[in-house]
Swiss-Prot record:
InterPro entries: SurE (IPR030048), SurE-like_Pase/nucleotidase (IPR002828), SurE-like_sf (IPR036523). Its cofactor is a divalent metal cation. It catalyses: a ribonucleoside 5'-phosphate + H2O = a ribonucleoside + phosphate. GO terms for cellular component: cytoplasm. A divalent metal cation binds at D8, D9, S38, N91. The gene is surE. Binds 1 divalent metal cation per subunit. Its EC number is 3.1.3.5. It comes from the Bacteria. Belongs to the SurE nucleotidase family. Its main location: cytoplasm. Pfam families: SurE (PF01975). This is 5'-nucleotidase SurE. The keyword Transcription regulation does not apply.
Amino acid sequence: MRVLLSNDDGVHAAGLKALAEAFHGDEVWVVAPDREQSASSHAISLHRPLRLLEVAPRWYAVDGTPTDAVYMGLNLVLRDARPDVVVSGVNHGPNLGNDVLYSGTVAAAMEGALLGVNAIAVSLAAPPPHDFGEAARFAAALARQVVARPPPAPVLLNVNVPPGPVRGYRFARLGRRTYGNEVVEKTDPRGRKYYWIGGEGRVHNEDIPGSDCNTVLLERLAAVTPLHLDGTHDPMFQELRSWTVPGYEKEPAP
C-alpha cells in the first residue's frame, strides 16, 4: 500500500512520526508543512512561490500550508505513482464538530479527496503530553479497510481518538462546539495595541447523542465521521425555489 502522509503541525511533529511508524511495512511518503500551521483551514498559496525540501528519504517539507503540501505531494512528488490513501495527522488535539471548518489537518485530507484520493484526517483528543501511538495505529487499520473496500467516489473520513487504548469506535455525526468569542486587547512595549482572538479554556460541546463530541469526550470511543465535499444545503435550496428577488427575473430564457 502506498500512503501519502501530511499534517498541520509541521514536518517534524511527533504525531506525524507516529503515523509513519504505524504504516511500517507500507510504502510511506511524507509531504508536510515545514512549520506549525494549525487552524490554517483550506488556505492555498497562489501568490508566492513554494519551496520543497527533502529532509529524509521520501520525507519532504513545504514552506506552505497543509493544502499546499498535499497538492505538491499528489501533483509533483507522487505525480506518476498515485497513493492508495492520504492520511493527515496525528493532530495534537481534537478536531470535533465545527472544528473541521478551521482545521488544517482536515483540510489536508480534504485536498486529497478533492484530487481524487481516499483520505483520512486523524486527531488525538487529549491534552499534552501526547501518546500518539494508539491513534496512529487506529488510523492505519482504518486506512487498510478503505483501500480494501474502496467507495465509488473518494471518501473523506474525520477521525478523533480519545486518550489511552481504543476500546471501540462509532461512526458518528459532527457535533457542535463553541469557543469563547472574545477579543483580548494588549499593549506592546511601544504602546501599540494588539489583539488575541478565540479565547482560551471556554469550549462548550452541545450534548447531541451520537455526535463525535459525545462519542469521544463522554463515551471515550473513537469517532469516525464521513465528511461531504458538496457544501450545498439541500433543504434551504428547496426553500429558495419559492423565493423571488424584487426587480429581477428568475431563470430568464437565454
